Design a protein with these regions (language model features):
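Gly/Ser/Thr-rich loops at beta-strand to alpha-helix junctions
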Residues: 35-40, 59-60, 97, 116, ...
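Small-residue helix-packing motif on alpha-helices
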Residues: 63, 83, 99, 234-238
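Rossmann-fold dinucleotide-binding core
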Residues: 117-209
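Active-site-proximal catalytic alpha-helix in oxidoreductases
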Residues: 174-229, 235-253
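NAD(P)-dependent Rossmann-like dehydrogenase/reductase catalytic/cofactor-binding core
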Residues: 2-3, 8-14, 229-344
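NAD(P)+-binding Rossmann beta1-loop-alpha1 motif at the extreme N-terminus of oxidoreductases
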Residues: 2-74
Length: 344
């Protein structure tokens, strides 16, 4: 398929229907390890689509959530070790830190002929740092939904689909491609586009630190601060920085592109946007280049490994998120959201 003049391999539901996916995986036991971020959405979608699915999860709140979602202890819900033992396809949907922690326990169950599935290329791409080196006699594949597990599940229930990338790291069986696409269709992907573990991992970490999360918070905060420093009220600064973007403009360029969004704004807005996008691009691109280099060399992966392995990681994370949540900009957001007509 043509993406901006570049031909890429894409698989759609039309050419690879659900019935074909079911036939390919009819004799497989799909063991979903981890019921945190991606686990609930992928496992429930597979179950609802008629596949043989079990879940592996350690006791705790997440285990209780799995029970609440209809997974039955001893029948479809097991320990991570027992699920890995029973599964012929092992879907490793644990966090990157958890994958590293359980790898010594998991590896004995990666016996010849099995398939190891990931939804992120982190553990394999930087396996010199993670220690996650799979046996050579198993298939190692990936389907990476381009969004959260919650979005994957919500869109599935709405009859829609979240796009996913796919990759094959090892094809010991000669059937890895069919299994990969079948699983991608089974979890509810809208369409699947080809990548590699390395490309997925580097683009994913770049996106999270860049325009999807890190950069957008930095950009929004900078504009909000400048407006506040120049006498604008919190509500005005927030509306002109965040609320108009998320509620009015993003739906426009999500639907038909940036040019269409520009075309549906005032001529004053159009002129200003066209004039200032260049200076912003020139200021931001060097930062993006620095970020990408830090990701590609493994530095960002090492930061994540070191940070997430500390015993007080969760406490420090909660403190950082608390500071973000209690900042003036995001406290203003709470009030603004309450004033939306649909919330009254």
């Amino acid at each position: 398929m043509n993406f901006g003049g570049v031909i890429e391999n894409v698989v759609t539901r039309e050419e690879f229907p659900l019935e074909k996916a079911r036939e390919i995986l009819k004799n497989e036991t799909i063991a979903v390890l981890g019921y945190g971020v991606q686990g609930p959405g992928q496992s429930q979608n597979l179950r609802d689509n008629g596949f043989n699915v079990i879940v592996g999860q350690r006791p705790g709140k997440t285990y209780e959530k799995a029970v609440a979602d209809g997974w039955v202890p001893g029948e479809t819900l097991f320990s991570i070790e027992e699920a890995a033992k029973r599964g012929t396809i092992i879907m490793c949907l644990l966090s990157d830190a958890a994958v590293m922690a359980v790898w010594p326990t998991l590896k004995p169950y990666l016996t010849s002929g099995k398939t190891l599935y990931f939804s992120h290329g982190f553990a394999i791409t930087w396996n010199d740092r993670t220690g996650c080196v799979p046996p050579t006699d198993i298939d190692v594949i990936m389907v990476a939904p381009k969004g959260s597990g919650t979005s994957l599940r919500t869109m599935f229930l709405e009859g829609r689909g979240l796009n996913s990338s796919y990759a094959i790291y090892q094809d010991a069986s000669g059937k890895a491609y069919d299994k990969t696409i079948a699983l991608g269709i089974g979890i509810g992907s809208g369409y699947l586009f080809e990548t590699t573990f390395q490309r997925e991992a580097t683009s994913d970490l770049t996106g999270e630190r860049g325009s999807l999360m890190g950069a957008i918070q930095g950009l929004l905060l900078a504009q909000y601060e400048v407006l506040r420093e120049n006498g604008h009220t919190p509500s005005e600064a927030f509306n002109e920085t965040v609320e108009e973007l998320t509620q009015s403009l993003m739906p426009l360029f999500a639907a038909k592109g940036m040019d269409w969004m520009y075309a549906n704004c005032s001529t004053t807005a159009q002129r200003g946007a066209l004039d200032w996008m260049g200076p912003f691009h020139d200021a931001i691109k060097p930062v993006m280049q620095k970020l990408y280099a830090s990701v590609k060399c493994g530095h960002e992966a090492q930061i994540s490994i070191d940070s997430n392995s500390k015993p007080d990681y969760r406490e420090k994370l909660e403190e950082e998120l608390r500071q973000l949540r209690e900042s003036e900009m995001w406290q203003t957001a709470v009030t603004v959201r309450k004033l939306r007509p649909e919330n009254n």
